C-alpha cells in the first residue's frame, strides 16, 4: 500500500512522530497544534507500513465527539478497515472489556447499565433502608460522593476505612448497600465500567495478559 500520502501536509515534527519506528512515545503539544492529525496518521502508518492489524489498534478519547472525529479521519486514510479498530472513549472500551470479563466478578456478560436518574433513586432507596433522613442526606449529594470514590478507585470496604464523620459513615453504608443492590440486579453504573475493569485487570493476571496482547 502506498503510504506516502500519510506524510503529506505534516510539518517536520509531526512527520517525525508519525513515521517513528514502532514503540512507545509521548507527544506533547498545545491546543490546535494537530495532535489528532498526528495520532490518526500514526495509526495509518502503523497499519499500512508496519504490519499492525487494524484489530490490534486501540485509540482512546475522553469524549464521543472526539472518537467520532478520529473514526472519520481514519476512514479517510484507511477506508472500511477502521471498523475493526477500537476507536472509542475510555468508558466504551472498558465496557467492551467488561462484557467479556464480567463473569469473573459475579456478573453475567449481559449486565445492564443504570442511568444517572436511576442511580440517584437507588441511593435514595438505600438511605431509606438505613433509616437516614433524605433531607439531611440528599440522595444526589451522597451519590456524588460515591461517584467520586469510584473515580478514585476506592471501593466500599476501603471507603469505610476512611470515614471521619457521621456523614462519611452514612455514605460508606449507602455505598455498600448500593453496590449490593446493583450486583443483585446484574447491573453496573457508569463509574463501575472503569473501576470494575481495573479490578479485573489487577486481580486476574491472565485477563491482563490477554488484553495486553490484544493491542499493539
Regions inferred by a protein language model and the residue ranges of each:
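A basic/glycine-biased coupling hinge at the interface between accessory DNA-binding modules
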Residues: 1-5, 22-25, 30-33, 44-215
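Pre-Walker A adenine-sensing motif
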Residues: 8-19
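Walker A/P-loop
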Residues: 36
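Post-Walker A alpha-helix
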Residues: 39-40
